[in-house]
Amino acid sequence: VLPLLLAWLHTTNDLFSNFLTPLLPKLMDRFGVGLGTAGLLVSAYSLTGSLLQPFAGLLADRVDRRLLAALGPVLVALGMGSMGLWPRFEALLFVLALAGVGSALFHASGASLVGEYAPKERRGFWLSFFGSAGNLGLSLGPIVALYVAGRWGLEALFWLTPLVLLPALFLLRLPPVRRAGRPAGFRDFLRVFRGDVARLWGMATLRSLVFLSFSTTLPYWYATKGLSDGYTALSLSVYSLSATLGILAGGTLSDRLGRKAVLVGTLTLGLPLYLGLLFFPAENPLYLLLLAATGALMNAGIPVAVALAQELEPGQTATVSGLLMGFTWGFAGLFYAPIGRLIEAFGVLPVLLGLGVLLLPAWALARGVREPARTMGV
């Protein structure tokens, strides 16, 4: 019951999380601000939601993780759901920063609980299920936000909050979840930032940087090629759907083949597929198949890295989950602004080709990670 409940909360948490970007034009009109000022809302939510995740995990490893896993999505839902209710921009900025803290608390504690309460021989599958549930929410977020706000106004978003509030209340009715024995100390926390977990983080960050840059640049690249908006939307949908399926498949395969084998294997195949994306004609319909294969392969390692980190640090599962999830994506995302300037200066292909080289050290880091004995069914 607990993994399924957490998967639902992940779907709804990330559904609400993805309300903000598509509604920026409406918020700009409401508050009379420009895009640069409105972008502060995105920055406030993203920074607290991503970069605070290891520290949210540090807290979750010391208190009742069930409480934090329930509180986090409630903060996100109330923050995003109330965007049409605040009279001042500054108030909304503070509320969304607080919502980001909620997202950080949920991802770290939720992934930790799923990894610990799933059957050990199926840990990879359940972490994949948890991850793909979040991807589903991210995909639906813009559709739901634009439909509700377009039909009934920004204020109507608040009526969606029971999607989170009711399951969160149900989670609170379950028994408390605290670690037995002595909690991890500060020296244990510092150990996470070196050794095998640090190698996993480095690998995941390099991989995220390459593919975040590619997927973010894709609409601009297509536009320079004269491809239609419809084909661009189709390509992004194919990539998003294949990423979700890849997440689900990756953890499941790692239960059978081993975590390290899946990580190294996906990176080994990922580089030639990535090069194919850069040099194969994007207007060819077969390009969509290549895009789907690459999207699935490069996202398959996300839950696998989390599962392996939890097995390497069983006393700090929330901390390492936060490090390998939001902190990885947030850290990689910080680099996209300078990458965008490089693309403007030198062109899409040279910059994306240069970024592809980063998959080689990512592969080497994955090869260097120690896999605990018998991760399949420990």
Per-range role (PLM):
Residues L51-P87:
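Conserved MFS/SLC helix-loop-helix module at the cytosolic interface between two early adjacent transmembrane helices
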Residues K260-A305:
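C-terminal transmembrane helical hairpin of 12-TM major facilitator-type secondary transporters
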Residues G315-E344:
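A late C-terminal transmembrane helix in Major Facilitator Superfamily
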Residues G32, D64, L85-E90, G258, ...:
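Helix-breaking motifs and short loop linkers at transmembrane-helix boundaries and internal kinks
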Residues L20-T21, D196-S240:
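Extracytoplasmic gate region of multi-pass secondary transporters
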Residues V95-S132:
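Cytoplasmic helix-loop-helix junction between adjacent transmembrane helices
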Residues N18, S46-P54, L138-S139, S240-T244, ...:
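Residue-level signature of mid-helix packing/kink "hotspots" within the transmembrane helices
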Residues F129-R173:
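Helix-loop-helix hairpin linking two adjacent transmembrane segments in secondary transporters
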